[in-house]
Each structure stands twice: as C-alpha cells, then as structure tokens.
Swiss-Prot record:
This is 26S proteasome regulatory subunit 7. Keywords: ATP-binding, Cytoplasm, Nucleotide-binding, Nucleus, Proteasome. Disulfide bonds: none annotated. It is found in: Cytoplasm; Nucleus. InterPro entries: 26S_Proteasome_ATPase (IPR050221), AAA+_ATPase (IPR003593), AAA_lid_3 (IPR041569), ATPase_AAA_core (IPR003959), ATPase_AAA_CS (IPR003960), NA-bd_OB-fold (IPR012340), P-loop_NTPase (IPR027417), PRS7-like_OB (IPR048723). Belongs to the AAA ATPase family. The lineage of its organism: Eukaryota, Amoebozoa, Evosea, Eumycetozoa, Dictyostelia.
Amino acid sequence: MVNKEDVEDELLNETAPVALDEGDIALLKSYGVGPYSKSIRILEEDIKKMTSKVNELCGIKESDTGIGPPSQWDLVVDKTSAHEEPPLQVARCTKIIDVGKPNAKYIITVKQIAKFVVALGDKLSPTDVEEGIRVGVDRNKYQIQIPLPPKIDASVTMMQVEEKPDITYKDVGGCKEQIEKLREVVEMPLLHPEKFVNLGIDPPKGVLMYGPPGTGKTLCARAVANRTDAAFVRVIGSELVQKYVGEGARMVRDLFQMARSKKACIIFFDEVDAIGGARFDDGAGGDNEVQRTMLELINQLDGFDPRGNIKVLMATNRPDTLDPALLRPGRLDRKVEFGLPDLEGRAHIFTIHAKTMSCARDIRFELLARLCPNSTGADIRSVCTEAGMFAIRARRKVVSEKDFLEAIDKVIKSYAKFSATSRYMHYN
C-alpha cells in the first residue's frame, strides 16, 4: 500500500515545467511541412506588402464608411449626375421692377399657374433679361435661370434654307439687266451699307419680280441667296393660306420675327398672288382669311417696327391681280420685269445648259436660238433634255446638232398648243 507521504515527496522532487523557446516552436512547425512551404510563405508576404503599397497609393484605408472597392466605382456616371441640372419651367417675363439696380425684381407669368415676383439666378446677368421675353425658371424658387429664344412655329422654321443654293449669276442667262437691278437692291445694302449712310438715304427694301412662267424669277432669287451670306427664307404663297382664322397672319408674324433675329435675311415670296390679290367682297366671305393674311403682310412690310437688314423678294406671273396697297413704294420699292429672252439671251441659255452635256463641238447655238422665237428659259432647257433623249435612243454618247434640231421641232413646234406664254404676256 502506497504511503501518502511518499507521494507528496515525489511531487516535490519533480522539476518545474520549462517553457518552449522560438527555436522549439519553429521545430514543431516544421513537422509535416512540404519542400515548397518556405517559398510559398515568402510569396504570401510579398503579396501582402504589394497590396498595402497599392492601397497607400490609391489613398484607400479600410474603414466602415461603406465605400466599395475601386473595381466597382463608376466615376463618369457619378460626375454626370453631380453636374446634371434639374429641368426648368418655361415662363414669360412681363415686367422688371427697379431696372438697373442690384436688387431688381422680375414679374414672371407661368402659364396656367400664376404670376410671381422673383429674382435672377446666380449664373445670369441682368442685361440678359428684357421685358416680354421667354425665360426658364426653376421649380423651387422660380428664379430666372436662362433666357429663351422667341417661340416660332415649326412650319415657319422649316422655310429657312440652311445651305446655300449652288446657283450663281453665271448660271442665269438672258437676265443681265434684271440681275443688275436685283444686285443694287439686295446685294449693295448688305455688302456696302456705308454708301447709303454717306448719302443719307434708306436703301430699297423690297423687289417685285414679274413676268411669264419660266423666265428665271426663282432662279435669280437663288443666285442672290448664293451671293450674299444672309439667311435665305423661301415662302410659297399657298403655304400662308390656312384653314383656321388667324393662322396665316400668325405665320407671317412668326416669319418676320425669325428674320429679325438673323444678322441679315432675305425673304422670298414665290407665287405671291396666292395671298396678295386685290381685295373684294364676294358676299360669301370665302377670301376673308386670305385678305387678313395679306393685311398682316402689308403691316410687316411697312409697319411701325423697323425691318433692319430684311430684304423682301416677291415673284408672280399675274401682277395685274395684286392689291395696290402691296405695290406702293416703301413696301416694294422696285418692280423688275422678266420678259422673254432675246436672241443673245437664248444663245447664252443654250450654252449654259450644254455646258454639262456631252455635246459635239460644231453645234451652232445661235442658229438654235433663231429657231426658238418667243421661247423662255424653261423651254430651252426642255429642248436640251429632249436632245439628250434623242441621243440615248440612237445609242450615242455625244449629242449632235441634229438631235437639237429634232428636239426643237418636237418641243417648240409640237408643244406650242400647250404654251401659255402669250396669255401671260397679255397679263404682264
């Protein structure tokens, strides 16, 4: 039987436990380690160092701010949304209180809502806002943020010819005298206004071009638009005849309002007899709307508002039907007649149209012009086209003089019963 005292003596004689040093710990960790463990551990430490270095360069610190990793950032969208302006509401400035003072107030009218007295936005100068213009206001304080252009009907905006026509004065034949008259009225005031200022006279404002169909009235208007850098607006007379009462007059007002916003503008009314006919009472009131449109046009031509650098060209085949109030000086200062071309003019027109054709060299254009008496430029163009058709039928690549003679026999003589030139000459 073991004695209790002997057990206690043995426990006292045992040595105290010795703690493991780093070498022992490293030795214990080396048990069961493969041959590449040390290299893997070195690579992992290098990866940690590189990751910490990248984070320092990016300026990123691990925090609880909720910022996602850079791979999920979309800086372009964030920048766009930060600079995106809220939509504005369209209003009209009706009156300015304390004009020229720093604390000026503006009375605006928001359609179908109410009237407000507001101030200017931070990005707008007081000189940019005038009475009567449209403005854009924010939806919170209704402060004026931007000035807006005047409201113009889309159909009027579509009338403007953006590109210059490719017709020059060299492409117009038989109208030498008429071109000179047009250049005096349209080109000279726009290109050399100082000549009129020195003499103390106002330049002519409008021109009426009249004559039979096909004599080059519209062609000369296109050549004028090419020559000047002014905006060219072509209006067909029938476009201003609208169904509802007041629509045609409103389109005329919008047309001249758009023209005044340009530096210089040429308005060409083609077939003006559609709206400019003499006033009469037929008893049924069918032409009342057309007459209202013409009265608005007369008011715009010579009303209270100065027209500035707006030149008006009008073309018609029937000058005898126009209203006398439309033709008086001050509205249409010059009347230019486009008659039938003479022999030299017809030969020149033949040369112009044959320039772009593959023709033989021995064609006598003066002889062809003698065979086309009382012909317009449109008739001569039809002759050239028909001569090309004769060459195509004969499977030739060059148009000969015989083709022109056959075309003259077909167009000028056979189609004479369809020609209305003599009738229009009676009207003109």
